[in-house]
Amino acid sequence: MAISGQATLADALARYEQDFTRTDVYFGYENVIVARKGTLVVGCILSFKGTDEDRYAALDSQGGEFPRESDDDEIYIDSLAVDPDHRGGGIAKQLVRAVIEQAAAQGFTKVSLLADVAKPHLGKLYRSLGFVEVKRMRYLNDEYEKLVFDMVQANTSQGYAI
């Protein structure tokens, strides 16, 4: 709830539901890919262009200063979630790959994210997809590793370039 600026979970959910239809917030529908099994939502991933982060940061209802998470030349993965009953089936990897493909289609060569070092399984997941750590940083009192998937580097190591 801290990031939403709302006092209760109900208020936070109402705020996110209202803002989901907007195009001037990073968690709007345009930045979300949803994984479904039939009609059931089993996962989702939220990403945005690094060039858009400052525009979104201006909407912070808490008025606090946050360090930039992204760089202008990349697509940034902000959030990834898979329903607990559907974990272990490759949904998270499919969603991350979808963002990488989308980034390439838009002319980007890098995709980045922050992984909480207190949750090593996250770093392991992203490393298995070719992400590498480029730095560590503190964000909201926690330590994160910034991981980057560089398409040119990944493809060159396989013998071809984009």
Residue ranges of model-derived segments:
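C-terminal "cap" of GNAT-fold acetyltransferases
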Residues: 64, 109-123, 127-129, 135-162
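A short helix-loop-beta-strand connector motif used in the catalytic cores of GNAT acetyltransferases and
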Residues: 21-34, 50-55, 76
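A short, internal acetyl-CoA/4′-phosphopantetheine-binding micro-motif in the GNAT/acyltransferase core
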Residues: 64-65, 80-87, 116
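Conserved beta-strand in the GNAT
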Residues: 34, 40-49, 76, 81
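Conserved GNAT acetyl-CoA-binding A-motif
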Residues: 75, 87, 96, 103-115
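Conserved GNAT-fold acetyl-CoA-binding loop/helix
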Residues: 1-20, 30-31
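Conserved acyl-donor/pantetheine-binding loop and adjacent beta-alpha core of acyl/acetyltransferases
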Residues: 48-79
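Conserved G/P- and acidic residue-centered "switch" motifs that form tight phosphate/ATP-binding loops
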Residues: 90
